[in-house]
Each structure stands twice: as C-alpha cells, then as structure tokens.
C-alpha cells in the first residue's frame, strides 16, 4: 500500500518536500532573493499557517501530512469560502491570504515540475470581488463653509485657506498638495495652470480659475516674497527658523480641524 510520501507518485504528494519547500520559500527566497520586508514575510507565514489550519480543521488533513496536492483548485475554492463565511473576513483579507498560497505554489513549481499542474490550476481560482465604496460629495453649501472655515488673523490660517482653495479648484489629493513647488505654478500662461505630480510619478497639467490665480498671487507675495525660490515647497511651515514642506498628516489634521469646525 502506497503512502502520501511515496516518491512514485511525485513530489506533489511528498509531505517532506512540501515542508522543506515552504521553509526555503519563507527563510531564503522571500528575504534574500525577493528582498521582502520582515512584515511581508510574517504576513505570508501567517497566511500559510491559516491555510494549513483550514486543511486540518475542514479537510481532516493532519499538519505533518500536508502536501502540495492538498492545495488543489477545489480545496483553494473551499478555503476562500471558509475565510469569507466562517471567519467572516473582508474580501481584501481573503484575497491577501490566497495570494500567499499562490506565491508558494509559483515558487514550488519553479523548483519542481511536478508542482506545475497544481500551480496552474490554482491560477483559475479568482479572488473575491471587493465592493467599491460609494464616493460622497460635498454639497455646495458645505464646500463653501469649509473654504471659509480658516480665519484671516493668523498666518497659518491664511496658508491653510489657500491650500483648501487650490485643492478644491484643482481636485488634488493630499499627497499632491504636499508635493507642490513654486515652479509648479504657471500663473502667466494664456490659460493659467498648475503642474501636479500624481500617482506613478506622472505629471498632469490642471487649469485653474481666475479667482484662484488672484489668491495665489497674494499668497506668493506674503509667503515667498518678490523673488520666490522656484524649488521651494509651495506650502510650508517654519520650525526653529527653518522652512520645511508640510506632511500628509499635517494636511489631514488641517482638514479634520475645519470639518469639525463646520459641524458646530
């Protein structure tokens, strides 16, 4: 009677090969070859342990007997359902857990052709749909209240007001606001615009309204003087006499502050 570790059946039934490959994947391939962070490796290790726990709890396969054959298409589909229905994890979490298993199978198939059919079949197991969250927009009156929330007395308040006006006019992300430099403003162009560095390191040019141009000219005079440094951060703070660009967290706090002010 042949067992699961019988080499005549191939490596996909070999439990020793499974555990040895998993160890090399986690301890050598990920940190040394792929240069993954300790956090990522820990996440992969946890995900693989969860899958092995599923095989024991649901499929009755003892931990020491697990082999690559147990990660076939049907078991992976059942694994997804188990994570979603029994564990009640979000689709994103379920998909991340599945990705770790597929990554191990991909590595194992490169090490041994016996695992290739298992890996190929795993690629037909698609992740769960991640529902897109509905985007909620400000009403005109709400947006007007937010833009008027900063005061005029403090210098920082006047800076914050300019940030809100420009961010609203150009539909900018927080990270794009922090990345703006003086040279990104093209106020004297036939159609005034700003040059924004967006996701993927790609620039885009966005026209701005005449009223915004007027606000920016006043802001530049106050915050950057008559001869602005082109590479200076457009929006900055001063600490110990030194200018430095604002962080994303800083702008998030500004937005939260004025949003709470508008609710009162």
Task: Write out the residue ranges for each language-model feature.
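Conserved catalytic core of the tyrosine transesterase superfamily
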Residues: 1-264
């Amino acid at each position: 009677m042949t067992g699961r570790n019988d080499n005549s059946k191939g490596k996909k039934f070999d439990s020793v090969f499974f555990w040895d490959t998993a160890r090399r994947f986690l301890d050598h391939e990920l940190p040394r070859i792929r240069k993954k962070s300790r956090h990522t490796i820990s996440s992969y290790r946890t995900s693989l342990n969860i899958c092995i726990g599923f095989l024991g709890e649901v499929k009755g396969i003892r931990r020491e007997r697990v082999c690559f054959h147990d990660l076939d298409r049907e078991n992976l589909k059942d694994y997804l359902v188990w994570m979603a229905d029994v564990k009640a994890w979000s689709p994103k979490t379920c998909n991340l857990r599945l990705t770790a298993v597929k990554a191990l199978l991909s590595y194992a198939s490169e090490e041994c052709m016996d695992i290739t059919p298992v890996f190929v079949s795993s690629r037909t197991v698609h992740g769960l749909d991640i529902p897109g969250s509905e985007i909620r927009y400000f009403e005109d009156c709400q947006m007007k209240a937010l833009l008027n929330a900063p005061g005029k007395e403090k210098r920082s308040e006047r800076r914050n007001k300019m940030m809100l006006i420009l961010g609203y006019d150009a539909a900018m992300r927080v990270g794009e606001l922090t990345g703006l430099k003086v040279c990104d403003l093209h106020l004297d162009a036939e159609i005034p615009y700003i040059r924004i560095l967006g996701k993927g390191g790609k620039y885009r040019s966005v026209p701005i309204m005449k009223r915004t141009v007027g606000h920016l000219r006043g802001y530049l005079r106050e915050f950057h003087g008559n001869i602005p440094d082109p590479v200076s951060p457009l929006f900055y703070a001063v600490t110990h006499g030194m200018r430095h660009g604002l962080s994303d967290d800083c702008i998030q706090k500004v937005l939260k502050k004025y949003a709470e002010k508008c609710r009162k």
